[in-house]
Amino acid sequence: MKQLYGVIGNPIGHSLSPVMHNDAFEHLNMDAHYHAFLVKEEVLGEAVRGLKALGISGFNVTTPHKVAIMDYLDEIDPLAKQIGAVNTVVHKDGKLIGYNTDGIGFVRALQSISSEPLQEKRILLLGAGGASRAIYFSLADAGVKEIDVANRTVDKAKELIAACTATVHSVALSLEKATKEQGSYDIIIQTTTIGMHPRVEHTPLQISSLKKGTIVSDIIYNPFETKILCEAKEQGAIIQNGIDMFVYQGALAFEMWTGCVPNIERMKQLVIRKLGG
């Protein structure tokens, strides 16, 4: 019998997940289908119970349900619980189990372009919202020991740091101070929506004095190269946009559901084509 997978969110029509996962199923000759389900906030509980009753094998969760979904699951992975958000659900032995592959997917994406272990790197996170939280906790879980957080509201950066139980040396910074100290970091990660289309002229941090070999990663993929990435590229940095994070988090969810490892490069090229690259 064909296995059913999907993604729930509102809006959902723009999602690239169905294209990516259905291509992977076809490429691996798997009898499965991935569908996008429009689910409004007021019927989330009913939708989750319905998906469970239908025997869905697993599904992704996107905006605005990543936090609210946690109330309707049977179990939640410890890392997802610490992050406070779920983006992947596995239906196993009659239970819906919630995970967060956003942060781990980002860490895997970052490792794919780093010639050295991330554990040895000094990292600066820009932003202290949900995406930053997932990435911060996942980097800490991966053994990174030095992660500073810069945010427009410094108190929010302090709250993020204080919530982590792992042994990490972290300092909360203003964006102004981070701008001055940018040359002391090995990796800079931009996790906010600043610079996203259509406000492409904006940047949270003016890149001006990076050290050689710095990696600058932005979770935005529209545009492919944000202002911060363009400036970093001019400084000779290794740059990475949000496509890698999107693909790696999706590939990890695919692996959790099926036990099969999809072709990452195939997924990435498909997403780039769909985005018009």
UniProtKB/Swiss-Prot annotation:
Q: What does this protein do?
A: Involved in the biosynthesis of the chorismate, which leads to the biosynthesis of aromatic amino acids. Catalyzes the reversible NADPH linked reduction of 3-dehydroshikimate (DHSA) to yield shikimate (SA).
**Which residues are listed for NADP(+) binding in this entry?**
127-131, 151-156, 219, 242
Entry EC number(s): 1.1.1.25
* Catalytically driven reaction(s): shikimate + NADP(+) = 3-dehydroshikimate + NADPH + H(+)
The protein's superkingdom reads: Bacteria
User: Does Membrane count among this protein's keywords?
Assistant: no
Q: What is this protein called?
A: Shikimate dehydrogenase (NADP(+))
Q: Which residues bind shikimate?
A: 15-17, 62, 87, 102, 221
**Catalytic residues?**
66
MF terms from GO for this chain are:
NADP binding; shikimate 3-dehydrogenase (NADP+) activity
Asked if Coiled coil is a keyword of the record, the answer is no
State the similarity comment. Belongs to the shikimate dehydrogenase family.
Pfam families on file = SDH_C, Shikimate_DH, Shikimate_dh_N
**Keywords, ordered alphabetically:** Amino-acid biosynthesis, Aromatic amino acid biosynthesis, NADP, Oxidoreductase
| Pathway given in the UniProt record | Metabolic intermediate biosynthesis; chorismate biosynthesis; chorismate from D-erythrose 4-phosphate and phosphoenolpyruvate: step 4/7
